From Swiss-Prot:
This is Isocitrate dehydrogenase [NADP] 2. SUPFAM superfamilies: Isocitrate/Isopropylmalate dehydrogenase-like. Shows almost similar activity across a wide temperature range (20 degrees Celsius to 40 degrees Celsius). Retains only 5% activity at 60 degrees Celsius. Its cofactor is Mg(2+). Its EC number is 1.1.1.42. InterPro entries: Isocitrate_DH_NADP_mono. Keywords: Glyoxylate bypass, Magnesium, Metal-binding, NADP, Oxidoreductase, Tricarboxylic acid cycle. Catalyzes the oxidative decarboxylation of isocitrate to 2-oxoglutarate and carbon dioxide with the concomitant reduction of NADP(+). Cannot use NAD(+). GO terms for molecular function: isocitrate dehydrogenase (NADP+) activity; magnesium ion binding; protein homodimerization activity. NADP(+) binds at residues 87, 89, 587-589, 592, 603, 605, 652. Mg(2+) binds at residues 352, 551, 555. It catalyses: D-threo-isocitrate + NADP(+) = 2-oxoglutarate + CO2 + NADPH.
Length: 745
């Protein structure tokens, strides 16, 4: 990328956002071209990442570049500008489905070896591990996070409030978390006084030393943590909570983050399934072992593995599983109509999305009968689950929040360089036997941190670098100064890791002019209470948080304030000087794809993409002096405001305006704004004809976009849809397509 040709890299991802991109990219290119801005697409879908991982299994024509690695390299350059859409954080079942689809399309990628026996199978599984979970974000997020609700979006939510369930003081909904034996209880932390190489090893009681991670390079000033979760304590906790829910008649729900925490949380999830169905597992364990059943991947794995059994044997197992429900609590459902429960797949119920949805619904989730019910929300790890209990307490006492009057909670998140738990996957292990787990200096043999562990415990090491902490503090002060809002650092002095952070935050705040700013440090629970008390009075508070709370709170507060987290402006000021603009935080919406394929209606709202693009143009304008880029950003913001005021967002209902119609209206309003502005006459003239054609043909174009709805469509794949077929589905208006081509001609 050069100063002469500023470039915006627009990521091609998965599911609903990918489908929307087929319609939106031609619009973006038509508007960016006159400003001399190049729009480059980069495919980082799960399918593309699988193909990039296995070039040696493909023909020359089938090979694809490793776009994710290239984007990772570009984040280290000062002029990089990336629009990052939500992508699938693949669970094992999703990965297996993507592999099969690619194989069916003629790509000879290897099968996923769930239980590798040979060295080759182990190597293949290791390569596929790079495609699992949140594989994209740690590579691209080379900066801290600045997420906030844009003014136009907040105003719209106040004028057009979304539905909110009522909270009752009599609600039986509550959060259950471990009181001992979890990561919080077993955490140790230190700040390094010099650079070191360390290894992670287990001194087993049997006398042998097992090296789990031979080398982890560390720098001066790094904060490192050692923490473990006891398998015994976790299983006892599940048994107690299931029994309590059964006896009190409250529905049981489990909330983990198996997508991001791709090593630890599937294990945590699997233990819950085994405890719930312990009688069936006790009876059939030998058979399950022979079949390779792994309920860390959910009950769906068990059901698929027993498919090959004779009908009588299969029916007996299913009957035994059903019999377990007689003395277990009712389970929260993902899809009541299809009988899919909370335990079906670890990626179905993700804590950062499921807890806010439950709180928005007045503390209720769906039961097997399709009715909303109070629930015991089980979040085993106490470190962050207590914030949810605090907001539940607040809602029980004060009632539901009111979107028409409530304040806003922007987030400044410590995220850069795989900070904290979200960078721990390659340093997380299921302990093979009892012993002592040590983090040891490779050169000197000095034991830095040590834990007494037992077989089955989950042990992990986390790191946060010094430079991201400095940058995080700087970003928090900057946002406080620009916005005039108070900043609250959500840090618990009783948690060893966060106590180390508090020392650094206090030190680095001295590097900035904080006169007149309200900056405080409080524990998570106190921070939640303080923020809620301000929120309900219409007051705004910036939450400066670590990486996990960044993830949790940028779903929680937007869902309460705006009805969705997809409408947030998410800026990642890259530490090398570039910028990445993430489009919302609401996932990639598989149900939206289902509706498109069945009814040719895409209800995905591209507002997040619109907002990110505006910020991307503005960034180019500021950094390169490109006045037209600034104008594109300014007029796009005005068009977004008009889109919201005129209620032209997608409807959920087939036959009404969908994503394609919403994008048309954005293009029309944007062209109108550019034609009407007086800062650049040449640009105004260039877009006057487009504005005229779109305005005159509004009814025709909307009709062309809606009359195709109501019938099934074929896009030639799910994880790797056919480009031509998807383009035909997503761009059905000949009039609109011709107008865009004419303005580029």
């Amino acid at each position: 990328m050069s100063a002469e040709q500023p470039t915006i890299i627009y990521t091609l991802t998965d599911e609903a956002p990918l489908l929307a991109t087929y319609a939106f990219l031609p619009i973006v290119r038509a508007f960016a071209e006159p400003a001399g801005i190049k729009i480059e697409a980069s495919d980082i879908s799960v399918a593309a990442r699988i193909l990039a991982e296995f070039p040696d299994y493909l023909t020359e024509e089938q090979r694809v570049p490793d776009n994710l690695a290239e984007l990772g390299r570009l984040t280290q350059l000062p002029d990089t500008n990336i629009i990052k859409l939500p992508n699938i954080s693949a669970s094992v079942p999703q990965l297996v489905a993507a592999i099969k689809e690619l194989q069916d399309k003629g790509y000879a990628v290897p099968d996923y070896p769930a239980d590798p026996k040979t060295d080759q199978e182990k190597a293949i599984k290791e390569r596929y591990a790079r495609c699992l979970g949140s594989a994209v974000n740690p590579v691209l997020r080379q900066g801290n996070s600045d997420r906030r609700a844009p003014k136009a979006v907040k105003e719209y939510a106040r004028k057009h409030p979304h539905s909110m369930g009522e909270w009752s003081m009599a609600s039986r909904t509550h959060v259950a978390h471990m009181r001992h034996g979890d990561f919080y209880a077993g955490e140790k932390s230190m700040t390094l006084d010099r650079a070191r190489n360390v290894r992670m090893e287990l001194l087993a009681k049997s006398g042998k030393t097992i090296v789990l991670k031979p080398e982890v390079p560390l720098d001066d000033g790094d904060v490192i943590d050692s923490m473990f979760m006891s398998k015994k304590a976790l299983c006892d906790f599940y048994e107690e909570q299931m029994q309590d829910a059964f006896e009190t008649g409250v529905m049981f729900s489990l909330h983990v983050k198996a997508t991001m925490m791709k090593v630890s949380h599937p294990i945590v999830f699997g233990h819950a399934v085994r405890i719930f169905y312990k009688d069936a597992f006790a009876k059939h364990q030998e058979l399950f072992d022979d079949l390779g059943v792994n309920v860390n991947n959910g009950l769906s794995d068990l059901y698929s593995k027993i498919e090959s059994l004779p009908a009588s044997q299969r029916d007996e197992i299913i009957e035994d599983l059903h019999r377990c429900h007689e003395h277990r609590p009712e389970l929260a459902m993902v899809d009541s109509a299809r009988g899919i429960s909370n335990f079906h797949s670890p990626s179905d119920v993700i804590v950062d999305a499921s807890m806010p949805a439950m709180i928005r619904a007045g503390g209720k989730m769906y039961g097997a009968d399709g009715k909303l019910k109070d629930t015991k929300a089980v979040n085993p790890e106490s470190t962050f689950s207590r914030i949810y209990q605090e907001i539940i307490n607040f809602c029980k006492t004060n009632g539901q929040f009111d979107p028409t009057t409530m304040g806003t909670v922007p987030n400044v998140g410590l995220m850069a360089q795989q900070a904290e738990e979200y960078g721990s996957h390659d340093k997380t292990f299921e302990i093979p036997e009892d012993g002592v787990a040590n983090i040891v200096d490779v050169a000197t043999g000095e034991v830095l941190l040590t834990e007494n562990v037992e077989a089955g415990d989950i042990w992990r090491m986390c790191i946060v670098k010094d430079a991201p902490i400095r940058d995080w503090v700087k970003l928090a002060v900057t946002r406080a100064r620009i916005s005039g809002m108070p900043v609250l650092f959500w840090l618990d002095p009783y948690r060893p890791h966060e106590n180390e952070l508090i020392k650094k935050v206090k030190t680095y705040l001295k590097d900035h002019d904080t006169e007149g700013l309200d900056i405080q440090i409080m524990s998570q629970v106190r921070s939640m209470r303080y923020t809620c008390e301000r929120l309900v009075r219409g007051l705004d508070t910036i939450a400066a948080t670590g990486n996990i709370l960044r993830d949790y709170l940028t779903d929680l507060f937007p869902i309460l304030e705006l009805g969705t987290s997809a409408k947030m402006l998410s800026v990642v000021p890259l530490m090398a000087g570039g910028g990445m603009y993430e489009t919302g935080a609401g996932g990639s919406a598989p149900k939206h794809v289902k509706q498109l394929v069945e009814e040719n209606h895409l209800r995905w709202d591209s507002l997040g993409e619109f907002l990110a693009l505006g910020a991307g143009f503005e960034d180019i304008g500021i950094k390169t002096g490109n006045e037209r880029a600034k104008l594109l950003g300014k007029t796009l913001d005005a068009a977004i405001g008009k889109l919201l005021d005129n209620d032209k967002s997608p409807s959920r209902k087939t036959g009404e305006l969908d994503n394609r119609g919403s994008q048309f209206y954005l293009a029309m309003y944007w062209a109108q704004e550019l034609a009407a502005q007086t800062d650049d006459q040449q640009l105004a003239e260039h877009f006057a004809s487009l504005a005229d054609v779109l305005t005159k043909n509004e009814d025709v174009i909307v009709r062309e976009l809606t009359e195709v709805q109501g019938e099934p469509v074929d896009i030639g794949g799910y994880y790797a849809p056919d480009s031509d077929m998807t383009t035909a589905v997503m761009r059905p208006s000949k009039t609109f397509n011709a107008a865009l081509e004419a303005v580029q001609g």
